[in-house]
């Protein structure tokens, strides 16, 4: 009988132990396990979100880089066009200035040539008059001298 009482005592003690564990030990363990499961699930969800965010950021960075390259190429193209325009304007301005200087030089040369011709005509007229005076050995009055010079200048 002793065996039966021991078995009943052990059964009662086991039942009390199970009840005590279910009442006081099991709930905190289950709470800890559930909290750990929740943290792990949240961590995995955060990791998935981070991977998606990283992919979006990389795609956005790639798009921005492409856009920046396009913008840079446009700016370079505009700068090259502007450079060509400035060069053409400078060439046109230089050609105009060159033509102006050439025309001015030609005008100065023509004016100097005319002045030299006029001086030469006057000198020739003076020499002709002096030669005529010596030949005629007489002096011509200034009014007659002026008329002769003017006629001689017109003829030359």
Swiss-Prot record:
It is a single-pass membrane protein. The keyword Transport applies. Its main location: membrane. Gene3D superfamilies: F1F0 ATP synthase subunit B, membrane domain. Signal peptide: none annotated. It holds the Pfam family ATP-synt_B. It is found in: Cell inner membrane. It comes from the Bacteria. The chain crosses the membrane at residues 7-27. One of its GO terms (molecular function) is proton-transporting ATP synthase activity, rotational mechanism. GO terms for cellular component: plasma membrane; proton-transporting ATP synthase complex. InterPro entries: ATP_synth_B-like_membr_sf (IPR028987), ATP_synth_b/b'su_bac/chlpt (IPR002146), ATP_synth_F0_bsu_bac (IPR005864), ATP_synthase_B_chain (IPR050059). Keywords: ATP synthesis, Cell inner membrane, Cell membrane, CF(0), Hydrogen ion transport, Ion transport, Membrane, Transmembrane, Transmembrane helix, Transport. The keyword Transport applies. F-type ATPases have 2 components, F(1) - the catalytic core - and F(0) - the membrane proton channel. F(1) has five subunits: alpha(3), beta(3), gamma(1), delta(1), epsilon(1). F(0) has three main subunits: a(1), b(2) and c(10-14). The alpha and beta chains form an alternating ring which encloses part of the gamma chain. F(1) is attached to F(0) by a central stalk formed by the gamma and epsilon chains, while a peripheral stalk is formed by the delta and b chains. F(1)F(0) ATP synthase produces ATP from ADP in the presence of a proton or sodium gradient. F-type ATPases consist of two structural domains, F(1) containing the extramembraneous catalytic core and F(0) containing the membrane proton channel, linked together by a central stalk and a peripheral stalk. During catalysis, ATP synthesis in the catalytic domain of F(1) is coupled via a rotary mechanism of the central stalk subunits to proton translocation. Belongs to the ATPase B chain family. This is ATP synthase subunit b. It comes from Shewanella sp. (strain MR-4). The lineage of its organism: Bacteria, Pseudomonadati, Pseudomonadota, Gammaproteobacteria, Alteromonadales.
């Amino acid at each position: 009988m002793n065996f039966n009482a021991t078995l009943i005592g052990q059964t009662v003690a086991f039942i009390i132990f199970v009840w005590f564990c279910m009442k006081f030990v099991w709930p905190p363990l289950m709470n800890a396990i559930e909290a750990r499961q929740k943290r792990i699930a949240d961590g995995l969800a955060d990791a998935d979100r981070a991977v998606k965010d990283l992919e979006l950021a990389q795609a956005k960075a790639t798009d921005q880089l492409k856009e920046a390259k396009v913008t840079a190429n446009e700016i370079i193209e505009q700068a090259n066009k502007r450079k060509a325009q400035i060069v053409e304007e400078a060439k046109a301005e230089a050609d105009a200035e060159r033509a102006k200087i050439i025309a001015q030089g030609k005008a100065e040369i023509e004016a100097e040539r005319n002045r030299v011709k006029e001086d030469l005509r006057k000198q020739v007229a003076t020499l002709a008059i002096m030669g005529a005076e010596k030949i005629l050995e007489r002096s011509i009055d200034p009014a007659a001298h002026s008329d002769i010079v003017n006629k001689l200048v017109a003829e030359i």
